[in-house]
Structures are given as C-alpha cells and as structure tokens.
Amino acid sequence: MPGAIRDLINPVSSAASASKEDTVNNVFFLEKDLFPGSKMTLHFTRATAGAALLPRGRADSVPFASEKLPEILSQLSVPAGSPAADAMRSTLAECEAAPQAGEAKRCATSLESMVEFAASSLGTRDVHAVSTEVDRAGPTPRQAYRVEAVRPVPVSGGDMVACHGMAYAYAVFGCHTTTAAAYTVTLAGADGTKAEALAACHTDAAPRVAEAYKRLGVAPGSVPVCHFLPQDDMLWVRN
C-alpha cells in the first residue's frame, strides 16, 4: 500500500506548513541533472497536514462548492474568516477552475472517487498508485539530499493520473491526467533520512511549469523540467 494512502487511513500529524517556496514541490531542476551522485536541498512536506480521509458516504453528504462555503464551514465547525476557511475557499476555487487543454481533472473527496477517476481516465480498473516515501515519521527538516539511484516509473500507454493533496478540513485531492515522465529516486539526507521520492518531469508550457523554465534559464518546452512530489501526492498508473 502506498504511504500516501496508508497515511490517509491513519493520519500523520504535521507541524505548521512550510512557506510555499520552501516545499519540495517548488524546487525545479533539469532532467539531465537527475543522476546518482547529484545533490539538492529539499524539504518534504504534506499539503493535507494529517487531514483525515472521510468515508465516501460522509464525504458525499457535505457540499463541495464555493457557493456553499458558509454551509460547509458550519457543518465542519471551521470558523469563518480563519486561515483554514481561507485555504478551503482557495481549494474550492482551484477545483472549480477549467482544466487545461487536453487535460481531464477532478477533485476527489474520498479514496473511492479518486480510484474511479484514475480508472476512467486510464481506461481500466487495473491500476495502482505510487507515492513518495520518507523513512521517518513527522516533518523532516529542509536539508541537503544526495541522489543514490534513479529508476523510471513503468507507465503503460504513456499517460497517468496525478493526484495532489490540497488544503482542506478533510483529505481532498486535485487529480488530473498527465503525460509527464516519472522516476522513483532514492535519496539520502544529511541527517540520515532516507527517501524513495517520486519525480515528475514536464515538457509542457503550463503557467506553473513555464515559470520554472524561466527560473532555470531555458526556453519553455526545450528540455524536461522536473520536481519531486510531496509525501501525500500520488501517481496512478496501469498495472
């Protein structure tokens, strides 16, 4: 069972979230720099911050729409105007935004709905998930990691479904189809932490990736640009 799913069933407590720029998902690098012996500074985090996974029946009983936010906050006992309420507002807006051209997307509020979206998008129920695994409980420090091994994630058919943990009162995942290349990377931290981290490498010019190209000083779409996935993100692929 992937760690991301295991931790939804048995939520992991988390310290306060790091700044957006400090998280592993926002450290971009070129695919050519992903090789044994390379080093980079990373901070593995959880967007869901230990939020519990709701049974499908319970999740389906709670509204999930921006226009219903006051009702949602009341049902979930989240104070209006609080940082948590603001984060939920942002998540709902992101979930309601139109998908990018050629992309299918859905925000999954239960494990069952996530599996259904992955299966329908990949054209088969014979799917499995992979996620980043870190060998220590709780938050890890921002530190230097050394790449020990790099292995491609086998992807039958060339496409997969990525599901990203989102800030909400319970576990919510923003899922979308992608043709990014994926790798499992063995990392060793300066403090002895070991990680089997998922890296996704993109060649598209989506706004977020386009900004990464600018940071790295290369033309958009010219070479693959990569980032690691946080511990509560998942990639669904065909078996």
Curated annotation (Swiss-Prot):
Entries under PROSITE patterns matching the protein: BURP (PS51277)
InterPro entries: BURP, BURP_dom
Any single Pfam family the record assigns to this protein: BURP
Tissue specificity as recorded in UniProt: Expressed in leaves and shoot.
Domain BURP: 28-239
Keywords: Signal
Domain of life: Eukaryota
Endpoints of the signal sequence: 1-19
Name by which UniProt lists this protein: BURP domain-containing protein 6
Name of the gene encoding the protein in the UniProt record: BURP6
